[in-house]
Amino acid sequence: MASTLFSRTFLAASHRLITPSLPQKIFNPATFLSRSLHSQLGSASTAYKSTTWARRAMASTGVETKAGYSTSSVSTSEPVVSVDWLHANLREPDLKILDASWYMPDEQRNPIQEYQVAHIPRALFFDLDGISDRKTSLPHMLPTEEAFAAGCSALGIDNKDEVVVYDGKGIFSAARVWWMFRVFGHEKVWVLDGGLPRWRASGYDVESSASGDAILKASAASEAIEKIYQGQTVSPITFQTKFQPHLVWTLDQVKNNMEDPTYQHIDARSKARFDGTAPEPRKGIRSGHIPGSKCIPFPQMFDSCNTLLPAEELKKRFDQEDISLDKPIMASCGTGVTACILAMGLHRLGKTDVPIYDGSWTEWATQPDLPIESVESSS
């Protein structure tokens, strides 16, 4: 079914290269039609709009900018690579590029349609909702090892590959996919600093539509995961995983930490949502925060160009909330997406073992017996 769905949507448009000289408008459909590869897709006729940003120096990622620069020179101690680096290494055979765009329910943006309109050359589409746990009602929860391996194998990702993930906002959902690969033992993964907006603002080409191969791989990944959860055999599974349990927390672990704090708990949501003065974007979710947690909104990790801050500036952000880098830290958010941005910031500071509460606030707030704090409750 998924393959047919992709064919209707993607094959309707020709595969072409959009050069920087063409007008570029930001895609913003009037209605959000789908967050899943299995949903019905409408047309994607809106183009992108360019913004003007100054290029960021490659020095920020600790690698040089020159054509043919080997991917082996990138350190896994850095969570990001620059658009200049990616452009120089775009044709490396062992480099996989993933468009992992995903948006909040109230944003009314369709990442699949936006991928059709414009994506970085060679990029595959990584469906955050499709490559997820199919046995829970919580959104995009971490899949099983076997399911993740099946999805990556269907996408054509090998263990020898370096993986660069980007999204349509700058740094947003790509951080979650960066974390997912690390949870399953693949360390050779980075986020594109500034994402697709930065890529386009730097004058680099994007492709419109998608090749038949990319369509089939994206469709096959979701279908493979569905089969795994139905108990069916999927072959071949070529991507090997090694689960890292210390990077993901469950509800019980958060409860235990609340009662006996051993980890500093940071929340990536906005201050208004944390305080309970703004409603949650998902209906039926209580407002407030987990007792004992501290609020560090994820945009504090970025500079004005929506790229990751230098280490010294990142440290200031955590110092302001009395978060010590010498003590254990865990992170949460709304559904386990933007918490990964805080983990990226801490990764740049050398703290590479920050777990994410996968269910995050959406899981916690839907449990009526669990305590919450808010401005009202504390006043």
Curated annotation (Swiss-Prot):
Effect of residue 305 to E: Slight reduction of sulfurtransferase activity
GO BP annotations, alphabetical order: embryo development ending in seed dormancy
PANTHER family tied to this protein: SULFURTRANSFERASE, THIOSULFATE SULFERTANSFERASE
Superkingdom per UniProt: Eukaryota
EC number: 2.8.1.1, 2.8.1.2
GO MF term (any one): 3-mercaptopyruvate sulfurtransferase activity
Residue ranges of every copy of the Rhodanese domain listed in the record: 91-208, 259-373
Naturally occurring in which organism (per UniProt): Arabidopsis thaliana
Principal place of residence: mitochondrion
Impact noted for substituting residue 333 to S: Loss of sulfurtransferase and 3-mercaptopyruvate sulfurtransferase activities
InterPro entries referenced in this protein's UniProt entry, alphabetically: Rhodanese-like_dom (IPR001763), Rhodanese-like_dom_sf (IPR036873), Thiosulphate_STrfase_CS (IPR001307), TST/MPST-like (IPR045078)
Catalytic activity: thiosulfate + hydrogen cyanide = thiocyanate + sulfite + 2 H(+); 2-oxo-3-sulfanylpropanoate + [thioredoxin]-dithiol = [thioredoxin]-disulfide + hydrogen sulfide + pyruvate + H(+)
Tissue-by-tissue expression: Expressed in roots, rosette and cauline leaves, stems, flowers and siliques.
Matching Pfam families: Rhodanese
Gene Ontology terms: cellular component: chloroplast; cytosol; mitochondrion
Catalytic site: 333
Gene that encodes it: STR1
Organelle transit peptide: 1-56
SUPFAM superfamilies xref list: Rhodanese/Cell cycle control phosphatase (SSF52821)
The protein, known as: Thiosulfate/3-mercaptopyruvate sulfurtransferase 1, mitochondrial
Keyword annotations of the record: Acetylation, Mitochondrion, Pyruvate, Repeat, Transferase, Transit peptide
Record CDD domains: TST_Repeat_1, TST_Repeat_2
KO phenotype (gene knockout): Shrunken seeds with unmature embryos.
Functional summary from the UniProt entry: Catalyzes the transfer of a sulfur ion from a donor to cyanide or to other thiol compounds. Substrate preference is 3-mercaptopyruvate > thiosulfate. Involved in embryo and seed development.
